Amino acid sequence: MHGCGNDFVVIDNRSQQLELHEDEIKLICDRHYGVGCDQLVVINSNNKKDISAHALFWNSDGSVSATCGNATRCIASILFKETETKTVNIETQNGVIECHKKNNQLVSVNIGKPKISWNEIPLSKDVSTL
């Protein structure tokens, strides 16, 4: 699927128990030897009230991403095709994201306020900011 210039491999895992490992994720995302994508997204079922689905996100290097706004819009689009509702809630590692169907081709998501303070942005290693 494509969302605002990003491309995703989306796996609907709601009716199965597929478990992917990092090497498999990297291979799927590889543009030369796999399908190729910016991120791999897995949609899982969810038994919580008012939650339509649970989503997991991986970057093409196999690392976990807590969420992705564009990928969440793609997942919401799939869910909207299955139901008449105009709002779905998708649970991610960053919490529940509320998604709205604006019309047949427009989906909006509320991913919250951006983190702009340097100490709120995760880094791969500790570094001095001075």
What are these regions (language model features)?
Residues 1-103:
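A glycine-rich beta-to-alpha transition motif near the start of alpha/beta enzyme domains, typified by
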Residues 84, 91-130:
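ATP-dependent small-molecule kinase catalytic core of the GHMP/sugar-kinase superfamily
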